[in-house]
């Protein structure tokens, strides 16, 4: 058994001892978590008719609160033990990273679930005729978007249905307008009615009794800025200082002037010539060279620069013999005669001089 296997066995023994010590708290945590989900399912599945008729579904908020208290108590006990164990043995997550991760994930889920239940509870009264809108009458969900009925529409007339076969889109805009959600990509449980209230910011839910908030998106107010009148007297002073420093900069600084395309090309050619001045030491006749080996280099990458920072011979040959440079800085008569092999397909050559 190597040191890795021994470390895994040690961690497994520590996690087993930790879960044995926290057996009661873990069981209470799991039981409370399941009861919260079960009770929340009753709330989320409840419609307006169920809310009115208590004989269909019985909802008890006190039961849910007791489950939440048990969940929080067991959560604090587990996290407190792991934190104390972490400080004692100096191990990450108190020696049981899996348990700490599961507790954290369950806590986040319960918090989001309770937030959804709060919106759902507030929304239980809103489908009424006096406090808000009724879903599927002046609020419709189609194609991933919520559509609101325009305030000037008469509810007694026949309204167009939102479906894939309705072709007159312009007519729909006379009746409905889209609602911009605060979190378009947020996934919420329940039907579109729950998604509608779950995606609202908290400020809009608190004042949701105001029907105008649902009818229109108010235009943001104009930005008002108060500028003191004395700044009009300071503008010439600032302009004068700016012009003075600008003149000093133009007189004493060496700023590069913009180059034309032709001048930039000439400068590039001169730089290349200076870099190759010490490389070319005369031409070698092709008859005095003998190829030792030949290898196809189609698949071999050829870098532009060597490790010393110098350009490779192939790149130098390509630059010197570039048609763009002929007639400008390197006349055609001054271009060195290059072996014909270098002008064919890429190949690697090794040469030796017969005279030596």
Swiss-Prot record:
Keywords: Activator, DNA-binding, Fertilization, Nucleus, Transcription, Transcription regulation. It holds the Pfam family MAT1-1-2. Residues 183-199 bind DNA. The keyword ATP-binding does not apply. It comes from the Eukaryota. One of its GO terms (molecular function) is DNA binding. It is found in: Nucleus. GO terms for cellular component: nucleus. GO terms for biological process: single fertilization. Transcriptional activator that is required for post-fertilization events. It is required for the developmental events that occur in the female organ after fertilization. To N.crassa mta-2. This is Sporulation minus regulator 1. The lineage of its organism: Eukaryota, Fungi, Dikarya, Ascomycota, Pezizomycotina.
């Amino acid at each position: 058994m190597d040191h890795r296997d021994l470390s895994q066995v040690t961690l497994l023994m520590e996690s087993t001892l930790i879960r044995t010590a926290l057996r009661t708290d873990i069981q209470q945590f799991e039981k409370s978590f399941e009861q919260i989900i079960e009770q929340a399912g009753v709330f989320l599945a409840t419609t307006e008719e169920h809310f009115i008729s208590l004989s269909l579904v019985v909802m008890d908020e006190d039961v849910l609160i007791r489950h939440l208290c048990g969940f929080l108590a067991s959560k604090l006990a587990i996290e407190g033990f792991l934190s104390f164990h972490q400080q004692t043995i100096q191990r990450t997550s108190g020696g049981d990273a899996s348990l700490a991760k599961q507790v954290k994930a369950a806590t986040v889920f319960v918090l989001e679930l309770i937030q959804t239940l709060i919106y759902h509870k507030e929304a239980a009264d809103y489908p009424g005729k006096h406090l808000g809108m009724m879903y599927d009458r002046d609020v419709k969900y189609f194609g991933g978007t919520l559509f609101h009925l325009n305030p000037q529409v008469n509810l007694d007339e026949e309204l167009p249905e939102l479906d894939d076969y309705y072709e007159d889109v312009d007519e729909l805009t006379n009746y409905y307008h889209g609602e911009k959600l605060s979190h378009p990509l947020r996934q919420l449980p329940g039907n579109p009615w729950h998604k509608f209230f779950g995606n609202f910011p908290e400020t809009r839910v608190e004042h949701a009794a105001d029907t105008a908030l649902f009818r229109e998106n108010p235009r943001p107010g104009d930005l008002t800025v108060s500028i003191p009148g004395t700044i009009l007297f300071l503008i010439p002073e600032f302009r004068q200082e700016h012009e003075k420093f600008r003149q000093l900069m133009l007189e004493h600084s060496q700023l590069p002037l913009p180059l034309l395309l032709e001048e930039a090309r000439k400068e590039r050619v001169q730089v290349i010539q200076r870099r190759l001045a010490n490389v070319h030491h005369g031409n070698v006749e092709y008859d005095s060279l003998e190829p030792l080996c030949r290898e196809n280099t189609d698949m071999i990458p050829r870098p532009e620069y060597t490790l010393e920072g110098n350009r490779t011979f192939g790149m130098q040959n390509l630059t010197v013999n570039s048609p763009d440079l002929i007639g400008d800085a390197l006349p055609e008569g001054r271009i060195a005669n290059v072996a014909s092999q270098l002008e064919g397909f890429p190949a690697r050559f090794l040469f030796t001089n017969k005279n030596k």
